[in-house]
């Protein structure tokens, strides 16, 4: 309902501001086309179908009439014939009818019984089959997604996850599936207490095969990321795909207690709540503790996108690797949950393929869109997450001494840049994972800069680079109450990338095929002070200039300036539903933001941002947290913020902080 309401709001706002609403183009009148006489009133598809049926068989149809009056007259005749009327529609003059073939032929004018003669129901336009509609999707096989994340390159180097066990905390695993036979070496069922592996939903089997399936049922085509890894099934979700937090925590606890017994190094949780979390709940603490116990914990970001603040538990846990979903073209999916967390930390860390992934289908289940008896396609961050879990197994095989923190750092700092502007992002995180580059993390050239930046201050660092295909710089800092930004300048002093997410966690900039010379990174405090560290990584040669060097020195842009305004007001979900405020944007602006504060325990307010042409460019419709909107490189002109009362307990007071950034 909230999304529909937002659309209505957008149209209403344009009408108020522009003074008029354009009328929709007139649609051409529908012409009543006569059926070919050999089909009668049946569509060709229905005519063909009934030719293969006996007269006493029933067929499901949609009967379309010229008007509602003709439709209502037909009901009595259809009842007399014994036809079953499933739906009597109001939106169109039509009936959904299940009817015997012989009676269908009579009303279609294809059969003269002598009782009805050759008379037809009056006003019938046509009769069509009530056919089954399937979701039109573009699937991605594991052969495609493995290449997308460069797992295939790891296989070519001889790494397949052998010696590593992945715990799948989910609906179970169908261990009899050809792709998973001989792989499930441990099992526990906290739902039904069964001692033999099974999956009565299909979700867990699909996830398990993405992480470590052999692809045996497809001659290796749909092979998982770490086909040599072993699996442990930890069933905490029932046949409907749901489960209690207590069971999930117990599953995490069991994985930690049995990690040495089964060699568990990675656990995958393609599950979670849809409500925004600050990462302090019991399940988030449990997965953080599993991380501290030495397990790489990989968690699905959730499927509550595209709104901000939709990362729930346990995805909001601070230590785990939270994964969003992109399609085969590295475009973020609409459903992938967006950060930040409820306490304004950056999530997810990375993204991976998760849009209609073809993987193993558990026996007797129909989850997703079945491809055949052995495979089904399904979308979700649930599918993206085991890609990363499998990659983690590859990394740990290649680097047995790596800690969970090292795995996470390597994945973040080598993730491919797939978003055209800032990399560190509440949708994409650090980018799409690259297994091959992460595995070579220790072999790449690296520089680390550390320092301290005061409130509103900045620090710059220079490095030389040559022979590189890429360079990235990732900024970390120690004060969660501060907001640091990161800028990258080429040897000519041109700003080539920037990252200012406004959230605590990390900022990342990067550039492909960098020109040889002296480059500059600049750490800027938008607010607060902090100790920081910047990791520079490249496949070329890195160094630090001595005495300034002979390369031209970059001339970083001046400190960003901010035009700030604070608006206050009161709204009510019945009497005064919305307020509109304007903000002037001048040339050279780099970002416009709005933060809406109110008492979230009693009220649910939403925030919308419109450009000078009154196009909706960002929205924030969280149900249990403050609202934030932003837009990069805004055009000059008057911008509009709309505060909307979705649900209030009486009148709701609010404060809106609007900011325009320059420089």
UniProtKB/Swiss-Prot annotation:
What positions constitute the catalytic site? 170 (charge relay system), 203 (charge relay system), 382 (charge relay system)
**Origin species:** Thermococcus kodakarensis (strain ATCC BAA-918 / JCM 12380 / KOD1)
Protein name, as recorded = Subtilisin-like serine protease
Q: Which PANTHER family match?
A: PEPTIDASE S8 (PTHR43806), SERINE PROTEASE APRX (PTHR43806:SF65)
What keywords are annotated for this sequence in UniProt? Calcium, Hydrolase, Metal-binding, Protease, Serine protease, Signal
Q: Which GO terms describe its molecular function?
A: calcium ion binding; peptidase activity; serine-type endopeptidase activity
Changing residue 382 to A has the effect of:
Loss of activity. Greatly destabilized
Query: Which residues take part in binding Ca(2+) 1?
Result: 420, 423, 497-498
Q: Is Calcium among this UniProt entry's keywords?
A: yes
Question: Mind telling me which residues form the propeptide?
Answer: 24-136, 563-663
- Recount the known activity regulation: Resistant to treatment with 5% SDS, 8 M urea, 10% Triton X-100 or 10% Tween-20. Fully active although less stable in the presence of 10 mM EDTA. Activity not affected by the absence or presence of 10 mM CaCl(2). Unstable in the presence of 2 M or over GdnHCl and loses 35% and 99% of its activity upon incubation with 2 and 4 M GdnHCl, respectively, for 1 hour at 55 degrees Celsius. Nearly fully loses activity upon incubation at pH 2.0.
